[in-house]
């Protein structure tokens, strides 16, 4: 067991470049590929994640719908941005207005922006 503890300590002291080199050397020595093992291990996790319901959303402004002034006013009210920043956000669409918000809040923000004339999508 002392030998294993020493190996763990030695591996923990490696830099990222040294660890990558070690990985390549082990692949050559054992005749395996680390990337294949990672792909196989990640596949079941990806399937499980797709089944889960998304809980955080990004509110993305995709356009001003020809009502730029109303949309800028609404962006300022929602985000607290100054006039210049809000105008830049609207003119630079598609841009995120808020990121990582709950589903209810995202839906509420989408309705507010659409009422002002904006086109919005949730991601």
Curated annotation (Swiss-Prot):
InterPro entries according to UniProt: Ribosomal_bL12, Ribosomal_bL12_C, Ribosomal_bL12_C/ClpS-like, Ribosomal_bL12_oligo, Ribosomal_bL12_oligo_N_sf
Listed Pfam families: Ribosomal_L12, Ribosomal_L12_N
SUPFAM superfamilies assigned: ClpS-like (SSF54736), Ribosomal protein L7/12, oligomerisation (N-terminal) domain (SSF48300)
UniProt KW Protein biosynthesis keyword: no
GO molecular function: mRNA binding; structural constituent of ribosome
Biological processes per GO annotation: translation
Keyword Phosphoprotein: no
Gene Ontology CC annotation, any one: cytosolic large ribosomal subunit
Keywords: Ribonucleoprotein, Ribosomal protein
Record's subunit section: Homodimer. Part of the ribosomal stalk of the 50S ribosomal subunit. Forms a multimeric L10(L12)X complex, where L10 forms an elongated spine to which 2 to 4 L12 dimers bind in a sequential fashion. Binds GTP-bound translation factors.
Job of this protein: Forms part of the ribosomal stalk which helps the ribosome interact with GTP-bound translation factors. Is thus essential for accurate translation.
NCBIfam families per record: L12 (TIGR00855)
Similarity comment: Belongs to the bacterial ribosomal protein bL12 family.
Protein known as: Large ribosomal subunit protein bL12
Native organism: Zymomonas mobilis subsp. mobilis (strain ATCC 31821 / ZM4 / CP4)
């Amino acid at each position: 067991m002392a030998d294993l503890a020493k190996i763990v300590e030695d591996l923990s002291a490696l830099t990222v470049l040294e660890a990558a080199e070690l990985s390549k050397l082990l692949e050559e020595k054992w005749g395996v590929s680390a990337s294949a093992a990672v792909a196989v291990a990640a596949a079941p996790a990806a399937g499980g994640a797709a089944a889960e319901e998304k809980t955080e959303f990004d509110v993305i402004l995709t356009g001003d719908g020809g009502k730029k002034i109303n949309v800028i006013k609404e962006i300022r009210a929602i985000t607290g941005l100054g006039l210049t920043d809000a105008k830049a956000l609207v003119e630079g669409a598609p841009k995120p207005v808020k990121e990582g918000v709950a589903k209810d809040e995202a839906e509420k923000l989408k309705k507010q922006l659409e009422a002002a004339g904006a086109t919005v999508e949730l991601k």
